[in-house]
């Protein structure tokens, strides 16, 4: 099943997210800050990221901006999971490239449903971006053909 990264400094919330995702069949990796996340992104890109805004050392919105600016991670689906609940905060997160926004406290069933829905949409889009015929693969996103 898909690997999901959780970027959350609150141990209790991270534990709830991890438990819910693992019980839904996902593999989970956890990070307390952006520096740890970026180190891991160098070697493995996840299927989805759950990202808090209020993190130590680096704001989640800055992390979001950096993820979207990197061609290797630009299309990774990101759900902001944060205590910032104002309409302005939500609009800012979505405008910077978040795919969804969940306010804390959140319902675990809603979180899992949003993860599933986002993965369903993005997985289909990724599959459509690659076309194969025999031993030929055309990657429309990379404008490349592989034999």
Task: Label each PLM-derived region with a short phrase.
Residues 10-29, 39:
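Two-component/phosphorelay signaling modules centered on CheY-like receiver
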Residues 30-48:
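Acidic, metal-coordinating helix/loop segments flanking the phosphotransfer/catalytic sites
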